[in-house]
Amino acid sequence: MRDRLLAAEKVKAIDWRDDALYLLDQRVLPFEEVWHRYTTAEGVAEAIRTMVVRGAPAIGISAAYGAVLAARARIAQGADWYPALEEDMQLLADSRPTAVNLFWALNRMRDRLMRVKDGDDPLAALEAEAVAIHLSDREANLTMAQLGADLIRKHQGNLQTVLTHCNTGALATGGFGTALGVIRAAHLEGMIERVYADETRPWLQGSRLTAWELANEGIPVTLNADSAAAHLMRTKGITWVIVGADRITANGDVANKIGTYQLAVAAMHHGVRFMVVAPSSTIDMEMASGDDIVIEERDGRELLEVGGQRVGAEVEAFNPVFDVTPADLIDAIVTEKGIVERPDTARMAQLMSRKHLH
């Protein structure tokens, strides 16, 4: 399966070369493919904040490279560079508050810096660490893809009709995707009849990104309005809902793109299995439950403007980016460490105590 996934790879969103970070601008896909070059932490933070790059794993990887760019600039300034570097790290951390991969990656960069020995090059150490974060996410994607496909076969070996939400493919990660990685692997093994992709308002990641990725690989995909999801489950034989995650808490609650919670409720009602696919870096064992998650809200103009015109001067907007799906609505969480079925606090702790990949 690994070789087949590698052979099918067509899309990437992050490239590190010539001492600069290149990001594919996901705001203009699929109509344009525009790459931006970044040489400062400030630029990377702005790219994360404005969603040039999005998807929890991709945000974490980009932040790690942003830390390298910050270190290069600060070290060049001479003595006492570390406090200034920490300010840059905080700037990166503040760019998106919900995706735990962002903080995980920056903490890993801090830890690596603390382990640099006297006489060693801190910049080289940080660059190597950022590259390692990038490559490890790619490897995690491959492992999760196989584990998720195996889980589908375990429960239902026949052709599957899958519903997915937002974008969880190569554009959102350092490799092949989380939820879309599982769908890719299942398709290569002949188990996918059709994928239904929620359009995912208001940024339309499903229609602009997911449908584009799947169509490019010849995977049968149908785009649907978010509000059609429950009707699809009732009438179109949906067998799995497969989504990603931006943060998973110690009890198995999942923060993901707004609309995920209502999918889980509808899936439970219709007897449709619900799978979450995310690397272990998305799991925050310091956060007890989803009640503790800070939910990012974006500018109301994303909802209030249609065709550049405001819909009503007195109308207010509620525009949360994420919601929290309780663990008791989730059939399985798939990570590179293994699978947790019917997640709870004890099962999540057991998963995270594993020292080796599944």
Curated annotation (Swiss-Prot):
It is an enzyme of class 5 (isomerase). The active site is at 246 (proton donor). One of its GO terms (molecular function) is S-methyl-5-thioribose-1-phosphate isomerase activity. Its EC number is 5.3.1.23. GO terms for biological process: L-methionine salvage from methylthioadenosine. InterPro entries: IF-2B-related, IF-M1Pi, IF_2B-like_C, Initiation_fac_2B_a/b/d, M1Pi_N, NagB/RpiA_transferase-like. It catalyses: 5-(methylsulfanyl)-alpha-D-ribose 1-phosphate = 5-(methylsulfanyl)-D-ribulose 1-phosphate. The record marks 166 as: Transition state stabilizer. Gene3D superfamilies: translation initiation factor eif-2b, domain 1, Translation initiation factor eif-2b, domain 2. Pathway: Amino-acid biosynthesis; L-methionine biosynthesis via salvage pathway; L-methionine from S-methyl-5-thio-alpha-D-ribose 1-phosphate: step 1/6. Pfam families: IF-2B. Keywords: Amino-acid biosynthesis, Isomerase, Methionine biosynthesis. Substrate binds at residues 54-56, 96, 205, 256-257. Catalyzes the interconversion of methylthioribose-1-phosphate (MTR-1-P) into methylthioribulose-1-phosphate (MTRu-1-P). Belongs to the eIF-2B alpha/beta/delta subunits family. MtnA subfamily. This is Methylthioribose-1-phosphate isomerase. It comes from Pseudomonas syringae pv. syringae (strain B728a). The gene is mtnA.
